[in-house]
Amino acid sequence: MNSLLSTTDLFIFFGSLFAVMAFGLWSGRKEENSEDYFLAGKSTRWWGVAGSIFGSNVSANHIVGMMGVGFAVGFAQSHFEITAIAGLLMLCYFFLPVYRKLNVYTLSDYLSKRYDDKSRVSYALIMVIIMVVIQMVPGFYIGSRSINLLLQGDTGKKAVAEASADINGVLSKVKINYGGDKYGSSPQIKIGSEIRENLSPILEDGKIVGVNFTENIIGLKPSMPMPVSFIGGNINNPEISPGDVEPFRYKLGILIMAIVTGAYVIFGGLKAVIVTDVIQSVLLLLAGLLVAYITFSQPEIGGWANLVARDLGSEGVERLHLYNASDHPSLPWTGVLTGLMVLHFYYWGTNQFIVQRALSARSDKEARIGILAAGFFKLLIPFFSIGTGIAAYYLFKDRNLEVAQDT
């Protein structure tokens, strides 16, 4: 398989990765005590606080995810960024003065001083679980998958189909919505959660064009179509599906990412983390703005004003509404003003890896300026990330482009 990256691309990618790690370790080389390790010696300037808060909250998968949600849902998703300002202001003027007055290193330390050690241990355990399950697992998954797909090249796309049953629950039809490509052997067919050995795919030039029935399949739900999955059949490795990453490569990617990130975090302390966060924030902002510029420069889009005008004329599929109806299935306006606000107060005011950046500031003033600057950068995301996803929605429609099946 040919890599999608050239030798120059590989040199830049891995060179910058290890350069950032090395620079972070070098920055944290003079740590002498706990305050240096946990709070960067309380010497961080406002721009370091801003860059580290932004970099800790926003990552490549965050930017890409917001583009995807903009494509699928629309501008209402921007409330995750806009209403974050309320949480940042709460941290800035209510929580932060208390934390800094008590001279705590971590929020666990604050709970220990305010209540007791049981509170400290309970909070620490909860935060470890949240960080691992909600943040690290998706980050490692997306990172390893992305790197492997770039390195191993085009391995094809999965087929997508749905099954229908008659009123008696007997399978009547399997509709192929997308035939995929690069199938070298017949994959197994799964309807719902069960593999069906008596179904076999019909292959033509590496694509699935139909399904053969060897006997009746019963016990299905007649009321709605059921998803059909195709397992295995890759032209290079029959054990995996087209577009998948080989399990060994996937695990190796996670291991490398864990070693690289763990090295500068564990050995460099908070100062190393802040330095690398600032670098990554600058790169993310520049890359996001560049992607937005390229997308909005396409003749089918023609800039923000033309996108707004086109969306106004797209009755029924508008993407630029800021508020959805109260019965919207995923993001009603009532949820924005209630549950989302509660989430922000927790995330920005009592979240260890956010608050610790502000605690490392050299003064209350520097901390506040840094927090407010991070909020400004957050307000850019709806336009260069979510807005780009909305523009991509209309661009894909005009060019009749296919959306990747795992998007």
Segments from the language model and where they lie:
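Residue-level recognition of pore/gate-forming positions within transmembrane alpha-helices
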Residues: 17-20, 56-57, 84-88, 128, ...
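Membrane-water interface regions at transmembrane-helix termini and the short interhelical loops
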Residues: 1, 69-71, 95-101, 109, ...
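Loop-to-helix junctions at membrane interfaces in multi-pass transport proteins
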Residues: 2-5, 42-44, 48, 65-79, ...
